[in-house]
A protein has these predicted regions:
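Hydrophobic faces of well-ordered beta-strands that scaffold small-molecule active sites
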Residues: 10-14, 79-82, 97-102, 131-138, ...
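Active-site-proximal loop/turn and secondary-structure-junction residues that shape catalytic pockets
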Residues: 16-20, 85, 105, 139-141, ...
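Internal, glycine-rich beta/alpha segment that forms the wall or movable "lid"
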Residues: 1-97, 109-112, 116, 124
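Short glycine/threonine-rich loop-to-helix capping motif typified by GTGT followed
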Residues: 143-149, 234-242
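Short, electropositive alpha-helical surface patch
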Residues: 3, 72, 155-157, 240-245
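Glycine-rich, proline-tolerant flexible connector loops at the mouths of alpha/beta enzymes
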Residues: 22-23, 102-108, 226-239
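Alpha-helix-loop-beta-strand connector modules within alpha/beta enzyme cores
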Residues: 38, 42, 240-252
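An alpha-helical appendage that flanks or caps ligand/catalytic pockets
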Residues: 32-68, 109-220
Length: 252
């Protein structure tokens, strides 16, 4: 339906999932580390359902004859797969999918690793498909120390909630995850303020442009501005406005 009302502009994204809490509720007993198996069986079925009636009796999914109605306008809807490990890069290229990667809070070397895995998967698939490569990073553009401090405080709070969901460490009340204190987490050095400012797309417009140019040189085709970092609405609007007004023109 979305492809229909958008005039054939749907791009479909799929991933293996991340939060053990979600797996516990959707499929009790399913380990987070096994989510990719379900995703890999699912994607060909989604594509088949877009074409017409299909029934399936597989290892992970079973259903009688069904289809998608209305059908997509596009003969082939572009598909994006979220990938961070070689097995998922290989799968994405076998299925002729574009790839989106997210280095979490890690440094640029993590993005370089993903590009190496992508190139290896392209060579391994050897099917003539050249994917678009997107990189997602938390982003905050600011002009002074107060803006920097607000962005760092916000992302540290959100990361504490992320760890709660990812590792199933705390409770969720009325839809809001409890923040796990970062100083209690193993590997907490990855949430150091200076490291976050360096690794994420944080900084003045000039700094963010320089950071993005590194991704462009690496071979990243598209950048996803990850705005979900807990900033207040006004601060978030200011950041996005700076990005639109002063960062985007550098890449046009």
């Amino acid at each position: 339906f979305l492809d229909l009302i958008s005039g054939g502009r749907l791009e479909f994204g799929i991933g293996s999932g991340a939060y053990q809490r979600e797996f516990d509720r959707m499929h009790p007993g399913l380990k987070q580390s096994d989510g990719w198996k379900y995703m890999q069986e699912m994607l060909p079925l989604v594509r088949a359902l877009w074409q017409g009636d299909v029934a399936h009796d597989g290892q992970f999914w079973q259903f009688p004859s069904a289809t998608s109605c209305p059908k997509p306008v596009q003969p082939e809807v572009p598909v994006w797969v979220a990938a961070r490990s070689p097995i998922t890069f290989d799968y994405a290229l076998r299925e002729k999918c574009h790839v989106m990667s997210w280095p979490l809070t890690r440094g640029f070397s993590e993005a370089e690793l993903y590009k190496q895995q992508l190139d290896a998967a392209v060579a391994k698939a050897d099917n003539g498909f050249r994917p678009n490569f997107a990189m997602m990073r938390h982003a905050a553009v600011y002009e002074n120390a107060a803006g920097r401090d607000a962005a760092i405080a916000a992302i540290q709070c959100v990361l504490g909630q992320f760890e709660n969901l990812f590792r199933n460490l705390g409770d969720v009340k009325n839809g809001f995850p409890k923040q796990v204190p970062l100083d209690e987490l193993q590997g907490r050095e990855q949430y150091n303020a200076a490291m976050l400012e360096e690794n994420l797309l944080f900084g003045s417009p000039e700094t963010v442009i320089k950071k993005l140019q590194k991704y462009q040189s690496l071979g990243v085709d598209e950048f996803i501005y990850y705005a979900s970092l807990g900033l207040g609405m006004e601060a978030q609007k200011q950041s996005l406005q700076l990005f639109c007004d002063e960062v985007i023109p550098a890449f046009q």
